[in-house]
Amino acid sequence: MQKYFVEARQLLALAIPVILAQVAQTAMGFVDTVMAGGYSATDMAAVAIGTSIWLPAILFGHGLLLALTPVVAQLNGSGRRDRIAQQVRQGFWLAGFVSVLIMVVLWNAGYIISSMHNIDPLLAEKAVGYLRALLWGAPGYLFFQVARNQCEGLAKTKPGMVMGFIGLLVNIPVNYIFIYGHFGMPELGGVGCGVATASVYWVMFASMLWWVRRARSMRDIRCAERFSRPDVAVLLRLVQLGLPIALALFFEVTLFAVVALLVSPLGIIDVAGHQIALNFSSLMFVLPLSLAAAVTIRVGFRLGQGSTIDAQVSARTGVGVGVCLAVFTAIFTVLMREQIALLYNDNPEVVLLASHLMLLAAIYQISDSIQVIGSGILRGYKDTRSIFFITFTAYWVLGLPSGYLLALTDMVVPRMGPAGFWCGFIIGLTSAAIMMMLRMRFLQRQPSSIILQRAAR
């Protein structure tokens, strides 16, 4: 039992900085929304529309690069640190290629925005302007993620946290300058948020690169000291590992976007209640998401050391800690749901609906925690293809259709409205949690030679 407590301490030591980094990232989005809203409601709406297109695109690239973390962790655990620099260099090449693809998509996002039903022309113009400013930050963001994944693969999660807060602190004054036009800069309104955020991503990358080059613990890993051409074999391996993660993230983000669209015709009260519950549950999701990143590092490191038993200890401890955190957040949600809803809105009908939906959110928090930590475990085992199939099946084959039937039809029960979609979330996330755990057990029961051979690829 002692080894599980020791492992839990190590996991939390890795996870807490990741949690704080996520908080900083979320706060940046909050600052953009508030400061754009202070300029005008139209600019705030433009930032919201632009962000809804930016997030799926950039998270696809982010997911692709997550493959680097278990690769670096495994090489570090096996004592092959001399090979890490080559993997990271190829990670930068991959980030560059994906950045170009994302920038092309975002530059042409005007076609998506203009096709929206009854959208105001001025709003559409501002949303396109915001995206065309923000897209120049895509390379900076993805390069930052490569450097961050290198650090996290080496069990250094604090640098990502520090750079996240540097980005947040820089974002506020730069937003002010470009939104309102100070110090000789043009007054851009909501578009200025895009300029500021793009600039901040490059600042975060430059700061992280400076830290990596200065850190004593990484002096033997010199990624920038020699140029290396794209290595097709390494790039293909990173894509093979990262593409299923990227697609899983994309399907998860688009699921919630589709549900938001399906809820929108139900009326202002339903939309507001749904959005409040979704926003709060997203904040709670930061805890298991960060723990999943820590579990990936620990499992990858243990497999690199050649110890499948210790990898199992890391995996089981991660699930146990995740369930404990989820029970705590679920109890907090149940007890404080009305007070939480009142922080967002004081309309009694909205508060009542949001409180009811948060009760359903509390139910699925345990499943959500298990499934996301299970995904982190499978990343550590480099079994990323399963993540894609499980996520797609749970969300799009089971969760969304069942939610649609419960929310908008009378086929099973009388129409439940937004609560039906949240029941669908419970079905989807619980299914994902069960399948993730079954897959984990299947992998762990394989002979050690097969597990270590897969991890070493």
Curated annotation (Swiss-Prot):
Keyword line: Antiport, Cell inner membrane, Cell membrane, Ion transport, Membrane, Sodium, Sodium transport, Transmembrane, Transmembrane helix, Transport
Signal peptide start-end: none
InterPro entries: MATE_fam, MATE_MdtK, MdtK-like, Multidrug-R_MdtK
Protein name per Swiss-Prot or TrEMBL: Multidrug resistance protein MdtK
A molecular function GO annotation: xenobiotic transmembrane transporter activity
Function comment: Multidrug efflux pump that functions probably as a Na(+)/drug antiporter.
Broad class of the protein's primary localization: membrane
TM ranges: 11-31, 53-73, 93-113, 127-147, 160-180, 191-211, 243-263, 276-296, 316-336, 350-370, 387-407, 418-438
Subcellular location, record wording: Cell inner membrane
Family membership: Belongs to the multi antimicrobial extrusion (MATE) (TC 2.A.66.1) family. MdtK subfamily.
Lineage: Bacteria, Pseudomonadati, Pseudomonadota, Gammaproteobacteria, Enterobacterales
CDD domains membership: MATE_NorM_like (cd13131)
Keyword Membrane recorded: yes
PANTHER family listed in its UniProt record: FMN_FAD EXPORTER YEEO-RELATED, MULTIDRUG RESISTANCE PROTEIN NORM-RELATED
GO biological process, one term: sodium ion transport
Top-level division of the source organism's lineage: Bacteria
Membrane topology, record value: Multi-pass membrane protein
Gene designation per UniProt: mdtK
A GO cellular component entry from the record: plasma membrane
Name of one Pfam family that matches: MatE
